[in-house]
Amino acid sequence: RLWHSDIKYGPYLPIGVNGIKQQVYLVTFVDDATRFVLHGEFYPTLDQIIVEDCFRKAIQKYGVPETVYFDNGKQYRTKWMGRTCSKLGIRLLFAKPYSPESTGKIERFNRVVDAFLSEAALEKPQTLDKLNELFNVWLDECYLNKPHSALGDNNKVSPENAYRSDHKALKFLDSDRITNAFLHCEARKVDKAGCISFDGHKYEVGIAFVGSTVDVVYDPADL
């Protein structure tokens, strides 16, 4: 199984400080052979964490793929993505720079999403949860269960049916192994009070470690 992923710039929602409108971003993971969307979600920030979160949720639902294929965006080409794929036994590939045809399948899906964004604009969602709720309904009713022009001899097969008809066994892993694969690690120096600073907070390590450098291992989805 080969998965693609991409980030699409979404609408502005009043979710910033004091209701200021803030742009949100859609991350999707799509099965190459069937065009089935394994997971898609709008997020409030544009960073590597949103890709990792979406990837983890896709894996939890559908197991691990043999290969993932990404563009060269900085949210994908990170040491943590490399570590995750290595830990889970996933082959990690990147598209050649300046070759949009290599990510054409998911780019075509992103153009289909434009129809959803037009519909969502009429609903005027005020929260990220509401936007994601609308997206999931649209995904089920207007994409996953609709005939896809690239599937089947008569172009009458939907991504949902194509994926469910693929009898290749899904590979599920223990939840602890998945959690471990997505952990991050950063070095911090212990100050004179025996504390370290991390993610805007102070944590006591102990006087015995003053001047030492310690590794902070953490789950970015649980900060």
Regions found by a protein language model. Name each.
Residues R1-T28, T34-V37, Q48-K57, K61-E66, ...:
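Mobile-element integrase/transposase regions
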Residues L117-E133, G200-I207:
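Short, solvent-exposed helix-loop connector elements
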Residues A33, I59-G63, G89-L92, V113, ...:
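A generic secondary-structure signal for well-formed alpha-helical elements
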Residues V68-N72, Y76-L88, L92-L117, D129-N132, ...:
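RNase H-like two-metal-ion nuclease catalytic core shared by retroviral integrases
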Residues Y12, Y143-L223:
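C-terminal, beta-rich DNA-binding module of retroviral/retroelements integrases
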